[in-house]
Regions:
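Outer membrane beta-barrel translocator domains of Type V secretion systems
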Residues: 1-108, 119, 236-257
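Extracellular/periplasm-exposed beta-strand and loop segments of Gram-negative cell-envelope proteins
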Residues: 23-40, 68-87, 114-142, 187-198, ...
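Outer membrane beta-barrel transmembrane domains
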Residues: 43-46, 131-259
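Sec/Tat-exported extracytoplasmic proteins
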Residues: 95, 115-117, 148
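Internal active-site segments that recognize and position negatively charged phosphoryl groups
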Residues: 108-114
Length: 259
């Protein structure tokens, strides 16, 4: 966070963040034998703006992010490398409602635009021209979860020097859970990719489309284990219901430390 302030009845927070990622995919041939691997090392830098209406709780998040990709596809005695840039812009809003003292329902709406541009590359077999691709997404859903006070109490340790720090039983830890079902619509998906060899007439162009609708379910749990340390886990599943057939799973573990 770079700035936190109050403006016209609203809480404003803005800042920057960085991230590094690595993915590795094993590729199989038609007969199930190993064909090779695809790896992607990525570094991201982004900025965010968060606005919260003090009286109603209505909030909005604006995010812009750029990512540098370094990709490598490897097979027996053959390597293919490509570098490029990805970008993402997101606008998300939500309005929380209290169902009970510690249970909250929050309708959410999000718009995302993302794109990817990779350099052309080649290996011993031929060449690939990736071109530029982009897609837009609208997500509508809600978040249902607990809204317990996450303040870290003094605990019940018999040793005074440990109260408020290390000696808290599991039942004393501040914990919140949540589930988030959503419908995601992808549209304006575009991007061509062509490949071929040195032989005349070998060039082929593919125009994959990601347009369609999918259902997404996310669930998570977070617990404050120290005054300044929060642990969290999250898992999700997405399945397309129209357009191209696809499904996916995701999982995430987080460690937040404040100082």
């Amino acid at each position: 966070d770079l700035l936190r302030t109050e403006v016209a009845g609203m809480s404003l927070t803005t800042g920057v963040y960085g991230a590094a990622g690595h993915s590795s995919v094993d590729v199989k041939d038609d007969d199930g034998s190993r064909a090779g691997t695809v790896r992607d090392d990525a570094g991201s830098l982004g900025g965010f703006l968060n606005l919260v209406h003090t009286s109603s709780g209505l909030w909005a998040d604006i995010v812009a992010q750029g990512t540098r990709h370094s990709m490598k596809a490897s097979s027996d005695n053959n390597d293919f490398r490509a570098r490029g840039w990805g970008w993402l812009g997101s606008l998300e809003t939500g309005l929380p409602f209290s169902i009970t003292d510690n249970l909250m329902l929050e309708p959410q709406l999000q718009y995302t635009w993302q794109g990817l541009s990779l350099d052309d590359g080649q290996d011993n077999a031929g060449y690939v021209k990736f071109g530029h691709g982009s897609a837009q997404h609208v997500r509508a859903g809600f978040r249902l979860g607990s809204h317990n006070d996450m303040n870290f109490g003094k605990g019940t340790s018999s040793r005074d020097t440990l109260r408020g720090s290390a000696k808290h039983s599991v039942r004393e830890l501040p914990v919140n859970w949540w589930v988030q079902p959503s419908v995601i619509r992808t549209f304006s998906s575009r991007g061509d990719m062509s490949m071929g060899t040195a032989a005349a007439g070998s060039n082929m162009t593919f125009s994959p489309s990601r347009n369609g609708t999918s259902l997404d379910l996310q669930a998570g749990l977070e617990a404050r284990v120290r005054e300044n340390i929060t642990l969290g886990v999250q898992a999700g599943y997405a399945h397309s219901v129209s357009g191209n057939s696809a499904e996916g799973y995701n999982g995430q573990a987080t460690l937040n430390v404040t100082f």
